[in-house]
């Protein structure tokens, strides 16, 4: 049975993006690092910021690509190759338009659903056989509004909902790391 060794938080690099909906994956790994009193450091060769944490005796590499979202797969594949991590040992945390704010879902494999960060990871890894933690940000209503929506900041109420979803995800992280996916899904997907 595999174990998660790398958690990737998707988002765009730069101050102007750090509080946008598209960066909720980065918010997730930043909270893990903070909870473990660890800081990220830039690894320019691997195109990412990295922090190493120990979660219940499991050594985990937290990765925030320093590429833009559309090229996240470059950093993910470089880190995976460098540390000899298999795709099924990777958890990718990202924003999800098709899930309401405050909801969080765990998924193994599947398509990219139009998410450019996932599309890039699929291309660079050559597979979609990794875990995803999908943090709901809601949908703006029409596809023409999606780009502006994901690149803007959530309202205070929506930010609180997203923060609660992040906390819920962190509460089941030990199960996810140890591939106890059914109990994790049950806790996350049950209201």
Curated annotation (Swiss-Prot):
InterPro entries, per database record: Pept_tRNA_hydro, Pept_tRNA_hydro_CS, Pept_tRNA_hydro_sf
Q: Where is the active site?
A: 22
Look up keyword Electron transport and say if it applies.
no
Q: EC?
A: 3.1.1.29
The molecular function terms of the Gene Ontology recorded here are:
peptidyl-tRNA hydrolase activity; tRNA binding
Kindly state which reaction or reactions the protein catalyses. Answer: an N-acyl-L-alpha-aminoacyl-tRNA + H2O = an N-acyl-L-amino acid + a tRNA + H(+)
- The organism's superkingdom is given as Bacteria
Question: What are the residue positions of the site described as Stabilizes the basic form of H active site to accept a proton?
Answer: 95
Q: Which UniProt keywords apply?
A: Cytoplasm, Hydrolase, RNA-binding, tRNA-binding
On assembly, the entry states: Monomer.
Q: Which family does it belong to?
A: Belongs to the PTH family.
Record function comment: Hydrolyzes ribosome-free peptidyl-tRNAs (with 1 or more amino acids incorporated), which drop off the ribosome during protein synthesis, or as a result of ribosome stalling. Catalyzes the release of premature peptidyl moieties from peptidyl-tRNA molecules trapped in stalled 50S ribosomal subunits, and thus maintains levels of free tRNAs and 50S ribosomes.
Q: What is this protein called?
A: Peptidyl-tRNA hydrolase
The species is Francisella philomiragia subsp. philomiragia (strain ATCC 25017 / CCUG 19701 / FSC 153 / O#319-036)
């Amino acid at each position: 049975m595999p174990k998660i060794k790398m958690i990737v938080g998707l988002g765009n690099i730069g101050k102007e993006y750090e509080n946008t909906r598209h960066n909720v994956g980065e918010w997730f790994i930043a909270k893990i690092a903070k909870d473990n009193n660890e800081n990220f450091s830039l690894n320019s060769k691997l195109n990412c910021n990295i922090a190493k944490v120990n979660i219940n005796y499991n050594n985990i590499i937290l990765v925030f690509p320093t590429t833009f979202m559309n090229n996240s797969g470059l950093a993910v594949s470089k880190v995976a190759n460098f540390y000899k991590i298999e795709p099924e040992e990777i958890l990718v945390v990202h924003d999800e338009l098709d899930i309401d704010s405050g909801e969080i879902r765990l998924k193994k494999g599947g398509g990219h659903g139009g998410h450019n960060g996932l599309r890039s990871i699929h291309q660079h890894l050559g597979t979609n056989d990794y875990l995803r933690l999908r943090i709901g940000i809601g949908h703006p209503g029409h596809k023409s509004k999606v780009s502006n929506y994901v690149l803007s900041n959530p309202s205070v109420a929506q930010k609180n909902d997203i923060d609660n979803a992040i906390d819920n995800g962190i509460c089941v992280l030990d199960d996810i790391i140890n591939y106890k996916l059914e109990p994790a899904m049950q806790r996350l997907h049950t209201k």
